[in-house]
Amino acid sequence: MAARDPEATKARIFEAAVAEFARHGIAGARIDRIAAEARANKQLIYAYYGNKGELFASVLEKKMLDLAISVPVDPDDIEGWIDRLLDYHAAHPELLRLLFWEGMEYGTAELPHEAERQEHYARKVAAVRDGQERGVITDAIPAPDLLFLLVAMANWAVVVPQMKRILVGGGDAGTDGLRDSIKKAARRIVDR
């Protein structure tokens, strides 16, 4: 019999949960499918994470932390930051799908672990505010609003790929053109 490796099992559960939640949302996800994909016992998932909602929250928290580490907000190089953000989401579209599902499921209701999420975004807003205070980017738009606008521009094409395809085309030319337009728009929004 092979030795059990709890960390490897947790990693398989995590990856299976990311795929399941990105595909089906919180309500539509099934622990049975996650367990089968992860080659793990269903009871083990509950032991590790408590319930499906906690598993979703754990998955989303870890994916958001990965983004924050991989693509920190950079007010000194907005176009470069937008480029890196677009690249990240092209390589990891599941994060935006998870956030979209979360929005559909919770709407304006308070999220589980909302205080931690607010801290996460407060750090990003602080980076934007720092750029404003140093005169690198405009302070005509409040820092939280500015961050929201920039992130929305960069993320929307991944959230609704059908609209991107319909409006700008599905090939590389459409994608490259949209990327350039997003960067130009971002630069104009932040210019002093």
From Swiss-Prot:
Domain of life of the source: Bacteria
Keyword check for Transcription: yes
Domain HTH tetR-type: 7-67
Mechanisms controlling activity: Binding of a wide range of cationic hydrophobic compounds to SCO4008 causes a decrease in DNA-binding, probably via allosteric conformational change of SCO4008.
Keyword Transcription: yes
DNA-binding region coordinates: 30-49
SUPFAM superfamilies listed in its UniProt record: Homeodomain-like, Tetracyclin repressor-like, C-terminal domain
A GO term, aspect molecular function: DNA binding
Induction: Autoregulated.
This protein's UniProt keywords: DNA-binding, Repressor, Transcription, Transcription regulation
Domain notes: Contains an N-terminal DNA-binding domain and a C-terminal dimerization domain.
Complex formation: Homodimer. Four dimers bind to the two operator sites.
Protein role: Probably regulates the expression of its own gene and the adjacent SCO4007 gene by binding to two operator sites in the SCO4007-SCO4008 intergenic region.
Name of this protein: HTH-type transcriptional repressor SCO4008
Taxonomic lineage from the root: Bacteria, Bacillati, Actinomycetota, Actinomycetes, Kitasatosporales
